[in-house]
Structure formats: structure tokens, C-alpha cells
């Protein structure tokens, strides 16, 4: 493992430049697609906030949460209905969209609708899966497994980059710390730059308590601002956050989702911090 601060390959993502020389971008939305109206309302509110702050924005939501704690938990509307709703978000709100895919997902069908594909953390070691997703040619956000050392993400990124797809990002979402708990090692954000890919920090899954409620995961959303500030202070290209108008009633990951009505205040702070950090060379 090197101590060298490696700059990511700059590239255009959904029409805006990404990298440490460019402003922080945001990937945000509810964990899972609940209703079309909720998706449109949330995307519209986030677009208004980010437009006002000059933050590039990608809307995210899942049509199938395949790794829920319980088989009885809500997984989403399914691919056909989920893609229809995401297409409506693109059409009506005018923002790019991201969703996660799985080993049995018809990748080309999803890629025909969404702008960015995301690979789940639990699947980061699956070589065929990672390369099949990258082979769609779409930008890919590679989630780091909760079990994986940050320096091992270079192997995951290399698998994706070997396909010829240069639009690859790596995402930190916390590391297992005993049972039912995650912590964020901020050193990983610097280490993961050695992949040569833009680094994204997932500020909401990082406060998740996996399986902490028995048949569902818990979370400590009160720590989202502290961890998000720390990550931006280290220097990142993008921030990933799950948000919901009423997190306590969200159908998935409510305990670690940030309230939509508090997004503007947090993003104002983070945007200011990002400009300060990127005004000088990283040490």
C-alpha cells in the first residue's frame, strides 16, 4: 500500500466533470422506490436544493432490495414498474438517475433507462458480475464491501476498468465493527484514490446498524452530519445519501436515512467545506 495521494482519472458523469479538481456532486434519494409520487416529490425537492447550491445531482432509488434482513420485508415494486418510475423522474424532473443491480438483473434493460449503475457492497468480489455491469458501458458506482480492506478496492476497480469502461467510481460505506455495527475509517477515502477512480462516500449506510432490529437494520442518523463533514474534509469527489420525507415511516433503511427537510442545511455546510478543501492542494 502506497502513501501517495493519487489523483483520479477525470471524466464526465451525466454531463458534469468529476474529480478532486471539481465541485462535490450528490447521489441522493430514498433507499427503495415506494410510490411514483414520492419519487417525483423527493427528486423535485432535491433538484431545487442542489440547483440553488450549484451541486451536480443524481437521483437514486432501488426497484429491488435483494439483501433485506427478512424475506417478509418490502423489497420494492420490481424492475418493470421501478424502471417506469425512474423514467418518469428523468422526464418530469430532468435529472439523471441511478439504481443498483444484482447478478440476475437483465443489465441491458436497466441500462437502457438509467444513467448510472451501482453494484451492491455484498457483491464486490463477484468478478463476472462486476465485469458484466461495466460492460454495459454505463458509469458504475462500485460499493466497497463492509468486509473489505480499502486497499483491496483496487482489485475490484481493476476488474471493471479491464472491460475498457473508464467511467468507474468507488464508494466507501463503512466497515464491520463487531456484530450489528459499522464504523468509518476516514483513511480509506485517501487509500481508495489509489484505484485511480473518483471516490464517493456513503454517509447514510455508514451509520447503519446491520440487522440491529432483529428482522431489520437499525441506524444512527444523528451521526450523518459528523461523518459527512469528515469525509468532505478528507477530500472526495461525490457524496451518497439516502433521504426520505418521513424517515420513520420509510419502507427501507429509515433509521439511517436523513430527513429531506434537513437536506438543504446540511448540503449548504458541506458545499462550503468542499470549496475550502479543494481550494488548496491535498497534502
Swiss-Prot record:
GO terms for cellular component: cytoplasm. Its EC number is 2.5.1.55. It is found in: Cytoplasm. It catalyses: D-arabinose 5-phosphate + phosphoenolpyruvate + H2O = 3-deoxy-alpha-D-manno-2-octulosonate-8-phosphate + phosphate. Pathway: Carbohydrate biosynthesis; 3-deoxy-D-manno-octulosonate biosynthesis; 3-deoxy-D-manno-octulosonate from D-ribulose 5-phosphate: step 2/3; Bacterial outer membrane biogenesis; lipopolysaccharide biosynthesis. GO terms for biological process: keto-3-deoxy-D-manno-octulosonic acid biosynthetic process. Keywords: Cytoplasm, Lipopolysaccharide biosynthesis, Transferase. The keyword Cytoplasm applies. Pfam families: DAHP_synth_1. Gene3D superfamilies: Aldolase class I (3.20.20.70). One of its GO terms (molecular function) is 3-deoxy-8-phosphooctulonate synthase activity. InterPro entries: Aldolase_TIM, DAHP1/KDSA, KDO8P_synthase. The keyword Transferase applies. Belongs to the KdsA family. This is 2-dehydro-3-deoxyphosphooctonate aldolase. The gene is kdsA.
Amino acid at each position: 500500500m502506497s502513501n501517495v495521494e493519487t489523483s483520479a482519472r477525470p471524466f464526465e458523469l451525466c454531463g458534469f466533470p468529476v474529480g478532486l479538481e471539481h465541485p462535490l456532486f450528490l447521489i441522493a434519494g430514498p433507499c427503495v422506490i415506494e410510490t411514483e409520487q414520492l419519487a417525483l416529490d423527493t427528486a423535485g425537492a432535491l433538484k431545487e436544493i442542489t440547483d440553488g447550491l450549484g451541486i451536480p445531482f443524481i437521483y437514486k432509488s432501488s426497484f429491488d432490495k435483494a439483501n433485506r434482513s427478512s424475506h417478509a420485508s418490502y423489497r420494492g415494486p420490481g424492475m418493470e414498474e421501478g424502471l417506469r418510475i425512474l423514467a418518469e423522474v428523468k422526464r418530469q424532473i430532468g435529472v439523471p438517475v441511478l439504481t443498483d443491480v444484482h447478478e440476475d438483473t437483465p443489465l441491458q434493460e436497466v441500462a437502457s433507462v438509467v444513467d448510472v449503475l451501482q453494484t451492491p457492497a455484498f457483491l464486490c468480489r463477484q468478478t463476472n458480475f462486476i465485469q458484466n455491469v461495466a460492460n454495459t458501458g454505463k458509469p458504475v458506482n462500485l460499493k466497497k464491501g463492509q468486509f473489505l480492506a480499502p486497499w483491496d478496492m483496487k482489485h475490484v476497480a481493476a476488474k471493471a476498468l479491464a472491460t475498457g469502461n473508464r467511467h468507474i467510481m468507488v464508494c466507501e460505506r463503512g466497515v464491520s465493527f463487531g456484530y450489528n455495527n459499522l464504523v468509518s475509517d476516514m483513511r480509506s477515502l485517501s487509500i481508495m484514490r489509489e484505484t485511480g477512480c473518483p471516490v464517493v462516500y456513503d454517509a447514510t449506510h455508514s451509520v447503519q446498524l446491520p440487522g440491529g432490529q432483529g428482522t431489520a437494520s437499525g441506524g444512527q442518523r444523528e451521526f450523518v452530519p459528523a461523518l459527512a463533514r469528515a469525509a468532505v474534509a478528507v477530500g472526495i469527489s461525490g457524496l451518497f445519501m439516502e433521504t426520505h420525507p418521513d424517515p420513520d415511516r420509510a419502507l427501507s433503511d429509515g433509521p439511517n436515512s436523513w430527513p429531506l427537510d434537513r437536506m438543504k442545511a446540511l448540503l449548504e455546510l458541506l458545499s462550503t467545506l468542499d470549496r475550502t478543501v479543494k481550494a488548496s492542494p491535498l497534502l
